[in-house]
Amino acid sequence: MKIVTTVQEMQHITKELRASGKSIGFVPTMGYLHEGHATLLRKAREENEIVVLSVFVNPLQFGPNEDLDRYPRDIDRDENVAKENGVDYLFYPSVEEMYPVEQTTTVEVVKRTDVLCGKQRPGHFAGVATVLMKLFNITLPTHAYFGMKDAQQVAVIEGFVADFNIPVTIVPVDIVREEDGLAKSSRNVYLSQEERKEAPHLYRSLCMAKERIEAGERNAEIITTLVKEYIETYTKGTVDYADLYAYPSLQVVDQIEGRIILAIAVKFENVRLIDNITLTVK
C-alpha cells in the first residue's frame, strides 16, 4: 500500500491507472475507520482492480457549533485497517493541500437537503458535494462506495453525480451493525456507558416500525409517532427527528407505498446518532 499526501501525485497516479484501463474503486472517509468502513473497502476490493481510500476530515461539511475539532482521528489505526482490507493507495491530504486558498466555487445542492440531517445542518451537503467533486476529480474512480447509514447523503450524491454527468458508479452498501443492532459509527466513542446500553433501542424502534408496516399499517404519521414514543420511553436521548419519506426523492408521503426510508436522529449528551431502514412496500 502506498500513502499519498498531495493532490498532484494522487492525480498523476490515477490518470495513469485509468489510461491503462484499470478500474478504480474509491472509498472516501473522514477516518477513524471501523467495520462499516472495512465492509466498503472489501466490496471495492472485490469489484475493482485498484482500491483508493481517502482519509480527510472535511471542514466544509461541519457547522460552527459541530464537532470538527474533536472528531476522532487515528491515522495509525486507519493505515492498519486499510492494509488489512486490500487498499492500494491511501490518500491522506492536509486541509491546506485540499484547500490551499479560499474556495471561489462550491457545489450548491438544491434538492433532497431540506429534510432530515439537511434541515438540521444547513450547508452540510454543500460541503459534502464540494469535497466529493474535488475527490472524484483527483482519484478518477470508476466506482465509489458509500454506506447507507447516511442514506440522505447517498441520495444527494446520486443526484449530484447524475446532474453533473460524472462518470462514476455510486455503490450504496448496507449498514453494518454491532451485535446488539447499533449502527457502527466513528462517533459511538462519545457515548457514555449508560447511553451505550440505551443506544440499540434506536434500531429496535425501526424494527418495530417495520413489523407494523409489514402487518399492514400504511399511515406515515402513526409509524413515526410510534418510533418517537418508543425512543423517548427506552432512552434518555432527545429525538431530533423520526421521519418517513419516499426514497431516494425524499418527498413527503402520507400513505406508505413504494420505496421508502424511515430515518431517525437522536441526541445524547455528547453525540447525535442517526439510523434508518429502507423498504419497498406494495
Swiss-Prot record:
It is found in: Cytoplasm. Coiled coil: none annotated. One of its GO terms (molecular function) is ATP binding. InterPro entries: Cyt_trans-like, Pantoate_ligase, Pantoate_ligase_C, Rossmann-like_a/b/a_fold. Its EC number is 6.3.2.1. It catalyses: (R)-pantoate + beta-alanine + ATP = (R)-pantothenate + AMP + diphosphate + H(+). Beta-alanine binds at Q61. CDD domains: PanC. (R)-pantoate binds at Q61, Q153. It comes from the Bacteria. GO terms for cellular component: cytosol. Keywords: ATP-binding, Cytoplasm, Ligase, Nucleotide-binding, Pantothenate biosynthesis. Pathway: Cofactor biosynthesis; (R)-pantothenate biosynthesis; (R)-pantothenate from (R)-pantoate and beta-alanine: step 1/1. Its main location: cytoplasm. ATP binds at residues 30-37, 147-150, 176, 184-187. GO terms for biological process: pantothenate biosynthetic process. The active site is at H37. The keyword Cytoplasm applies. Homodimer. NCBIfam families: cyt_tran_rel, panC. The reaction proceeds by a bi uni uni bi ping pong mechanism. Catalyzes the condensation of pantoate with beta-alanine in an ATP-dependent reaction via a pantoyl-adenylate intermediate. This is Pantothenate synthetase.
